[in-house]
Amino acid sequence: MYKIKKSLKLFEEAKLHMPGGVNSPVRAFKNIDGNPIFFSKAKGPYVFDADDNKYIDYIGSWGPMILGHSNPNIIRAISKQLQLGTSYGAPTNLESKTAEIIKDCVPSIEKIRMVNSGTEATMSAIRLARGFTKRNKIIKFDGCYHGHVDSLLIKAGSGVSTFGLPDSPGIPKQLAKQTISCEFNNKDAFLETFENVKNDLAAVIIEPIAGNMGFIPGTKSFLNLLRKKTKENNSILIFDEVMTGFRVSLGGAQETVSYTHLRAHETN
């Protein structure tokens, strides 16, 4: 059994300065009835805590560390860029080069707006969908997490398809009612909800592989059904690939389900 004496001490100190001692609820370890472990360094597939215990890292910082920790090629690239400055508050050619690489990897992408978090990405996508369609309703799926977006922090009530109820204090009920949550991979639940709200349906948002409930993949037939119905209805289908992009495959989870009709060059 590992000893985490220093982690416990650091946790008590952190609680003096941060609510709950952490900056993200998932780091609190409350779901497993434990205390957070404080890490101090990482190398390759391993992370080391403040007590110098060594762990195999199966999380990878929730996705981005796919090349391992302290990868020498990454360290060199970061160090080289640091010599040129850290932030300009203005455009740089690196943005365009990065966008071009991303577009080459994910052919469904036509244009890119870069943001600092998954929450900003989903919030912007929802706002754009509502603005473009001039509709209000959003369909999401149980177990899919899309960040700290007010309209998406909801859970479903009883029944196969219900209007959302606020899942966190501070979210107005009227706002939550614009979001309907359906059971993941349940075609009947989706179709029932879709028929009820399609005239005011701006978008359907989904994690093609639901990370927060055990990495359950959406079935190909289910995901294709979402594409088919949203296209017919002129609603937007949003794939939240914050966790799956470039990891499940270079083209993201959407590449693994092989939808040619997700491609940007699709013709009717």
Where do the PLM segments sit?
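Single conserved hydrophobic/aromatic residue that forms the stacking wall/gate
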Residues: 261, 265-268
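Active-site and channel-lining beta-strand-loop segments
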Residues: 37-57
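PLP-dependent aspartate aminotransferase-fold enzymes
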Residues: 100-202
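Helix C-cap/helix->beta junction micro-motif
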Residues: 229-233
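Short beta-strands and strand-loop turn motifs
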Residues: 56-59, 205-209
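Active-site-adjacent loop/helix segments that line or gate small-molecule/cofactor pockets in enzymes
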Residues: 2-41
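Glycine-rich loop-to-alpha-helix module at the N-terminal edge of alpha/beta enzyme cores
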Residues: 54-136
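Conserved PLP phosphate-binding loop immediately N-terminal to the Schiff-base lysine helix
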Residues: 207-220, 234-257
